């Protein structure tokens, strides 16, 4: 073979690498790819590739291949060196483990070199390869590495070894939002802040083209300032061009997953970013309520609720959630087609829920967070849960026999935020040279700056020396000015005190006149009443003469005599009480009408009850259900009446508040007008002061500069010529400067005087404007008064017409009253007869109660004997029937009474309506008169106030004149003192004198202007006086029209008075009848409540007795089985063999089983845990005891019918996925019909304030503590239950909505009636039970399965279809905290 010549080029090599432009550009592109951290072939990826190849090939079986062995021999040592130089886990000290998941854990670490604290996430390569889920970490790494967003947790570096992937992240010491929600009750203000931050964080993720898909409080971390950042991006997915995602698996946490993501499980996975907004809605609901909206104990239950979200989403009644918050949650938790945020984040930002005064969407990150974590050090981990050490062995890859490539999926994972590799490239060198040039230029600039600063410092020193000289002169002037100011302040204080006294005097005089006017008015009223009394006396005498012999006349005389006594008593009282009585009369008539309507409703309902009782005599249970429905109706009617009363009182309060607000608004309007004028004055003063100060500063600066230059020039010349006389010259210069300063002060004072004069001119202008405005207001008032006079004349004409109509109405009323009296007497007799009947029935009832007590005594004595107990139960049933018959008789009597009362009430209603019309007309006349009088008094008060204001203006004017005189005198004195000092500066003195003359001329001009202004002021005062006189004339005219009487015939007046008297008499009779009626109603209501309480107590006693019976049955059954066992033992030949077949392996017979089991407290094991019960299973019943002592006393807590059992089975993780994993093998479930359960009434303790559910159970009620700020009454004692500012503690039942004082419960008073609303009892229930071990669980399940009846239990004749046939199982739910389980398909 021929060799190539030595000088020749290699074949295929580039001809000139340095000279070829195309080759250089390709190399630059290649370098750019290697330097780019996002490139798949960057430096770290290439090193990872080499490292992973060596790790995957370095096994004995693979080294047999010669090529692999040569490769390893070549690169094995260098790869080990690379590993030593790269970052590794040993570079960090582990402080604490703060999280653990399926793929690894999160550690709090400190970097050894920099001593900085980080959170380091470890992911096991073996676990990811084993679960075929090694792709999720790429999205998480890329988002945290390249997001550069304040809403995303930052990744500082990522590295790996043969077992783990490591991600060193920003440490968030505030913990997650789960920790925050467990430590605090989150108010709506906080929820608003954190929801806004989550919205912005998700918007940042969406803007990167990704969907998070696992938004939950566990993935929301808080930094040291309390602000939120998102974490855990393992479930993130890239959106396509249309903003959608295709996925065939449901990804996310069950409680927060959206319906469209759930549907993707079946292969229909096509959804967008709106799935994240669903999770935000769930998160907001959880913050405000304390639980997720679709919580269920099983996964199936949770998913079914999410799919049926339209029906299953509901807000608890006891949670305080605003309308805007509810609206936002509903907008998020809806179908994806209409979900809020589908069209962009802007529509979420514009929602009214986020409106507040503290932050906006741009500065929320800069504002203070609601909770800032208190940290003791940089490694404080108090906001994270303590995690136990993982003692299990770490699994690793097995030694392969062929090439597997376990490390290949992780090539390119390594990342450094501050990458120092390839930093010495040519581009870097160019950057360095540019930096050196910049540094040189900056040094030159700094030198120039230094020289300029030195020059500045010398200039400043010279300026400071001059300022010190000025200060010494200013201090003297300030002392004199202070003394003057003190004297002026004293004088002003004395004058203001005098003005205040004058104002108080004028107001007292006005009040005195007002009281005198009211006294005259009262005297007139008294005279009118005396006239009425005299007329009544005359009528009495006439009646005595006409009807001396008849009995009817004597009754009327007595009534008239009573009326006379009442009117004499009324004369002694004040007129104000009469007006109040009329108002209260109108209000009471309205209340009576309402009570009467209530009584009618109650009568109708009583009729319905009677018919229902007659129909349902066959069965006691059916009778109870009808009674319950009637009670519900009755409570509903009483609630409506209470609501109406509350509304009426609320409206009255609103009227009063409206009037108060009107007066306040008028006062504020006046104050604002005064304030506006004051502000205008201040504005003018400020503008003048500012202009003057600017001028003074400019002039002083110019003068100082000129003087400085002149002094410098003089000093230079004199230093050259006169070196020997420097000291003398310097002293002379100082004196000259002093004199100059004194002259400047004089100049400034003159200019100050000018400014003050200008200020006064502007103040006078403002006063002029004010007075003009007042004149305009007075003219407007005059027009308004004229219109009022016209309106009043029209009203008077209308009132005369109304009087004629009322006279006709009164005639008709007198006829109707006579007929009513007759019917009333008959009704009273019938009512007395019925009351006697009722008393006899009550006596019979008491006798029956005694008999029941005797029967109870017999029951206690005969508890040991079964036959006696059965006999007692039959006896009890007969007593119940007898009580029913008595109840029916009572209801018949009540019905007859109520029918008669209703007829009376209809007649009274018509009379009351007519009376109200007449009273309202009289009230309107009195109101019109009182309004006119009040207007007159207000006008007089305004007059006095304006006179006082004019006096104050005059006083101020005088004060200003005196101040001007004093300033002129002081100026003249200073001028005289200064003339002696300014002898050497004659030229400057002449100039100053000229300026002083000009100033004096200006002062004289100002004085002339002031005189002219005073003249104008006097003219305006005259105009004011004329307007006032016109106003008083108009008021007098109005009073004249009001007091004018129209000529009316005397006969009509007497008829009117007579009818008014009769009207009053009838009204008094009505009032007494109504009082009697209300007393009877209260009495009947109390009796009803007592009956209801008695029925409730008796039903509870019956349940308890039945439970004790069941327990006794089980004891008897046990004794019988023992007896049988003994008989069998005696009959058998082998004495030592024992019962044998009769007993099971565990020592109990097949028909009996007992032991300790745990029940969930309030059906929520996560929040309240379990409670132990002693359980006995007999042939017919399952009995639950609180303790073995209760078992001995036959006092069970709960009893279940074995006939009503449907199903018994061990649970799975999906059934109780919130329970502890260790407890699941020991839990089993019983499914039974609700009618087969009998249970003791439990009084749960009131929960603390921190918890959301504070329900108190009592007599079937579910009371919730509350406060009422609007009118409401207690339905137990009928006393007020509200107050505007400090309402008393109250309770409201969330079933029947009855309201009462909390004191009745605390004092254990028996006033509260039992609840009238009960839940449906014919629905299936499930019960979870926890055994002590898995063996016990299996034993209980196997035994109970044998007990289940083969045929379904016969349904109750009056109940609905059994749940066993419908297979609809209602799962009990309660308030709980959702479990925080780490998802199995991603790290925590």
UniProtKB/Swiss-Prot annotation:
Sequence segments annotated as region (RHOA binding): 979-1047
Catalysed reactions, as listed in the record: L-seryl-[protein] + ATP = O-phospho-L-seryl-[protein] + ADP + H(+); L-threonyl-[protein] + ATP = O-phospho-L-threonyl-[protein] + ADP + H(+)
Induction data: Expression oscillates in a circadian manner in the aortic smooth muscle cells (at protein level).
Domain AGC-kinase C-terminal: 357-425
Entry annotated with the keyword Cell membrane: yes
SMART domains linked to this entry: C1 (SM00109), PH (SM00233), S_TK_X (SM00133), S_TKc (SM00220)
GO terms for MF: ATP binding; protein serine kinase activity; protein serine/threonine kinase activity; small GTPase binding; zinc ion binding
All residue ranges annotated as the REM-1 domain in the record: 497-573
Zinc finger feature spans (Phorbol-ester/DAG-type): 1260-1315
Chain positions found as Phosphotyrosine: 722
Biased composition (Basic and acidic residues): 512-530
GO cellular component, one term: centrosome
Positions of post-translational Phosphoserine modification: 1137, 1362, 1374
Coiled-coil parts of chain: 1054-1126
The family this protein is said to belong to: Belongs to the protein kinase superfamily. AGC Ser/Thr protein kinase family.
Identification of the protein by name: Rho-associated protein kinase 2
Source species: Sus scrofa (Pig)
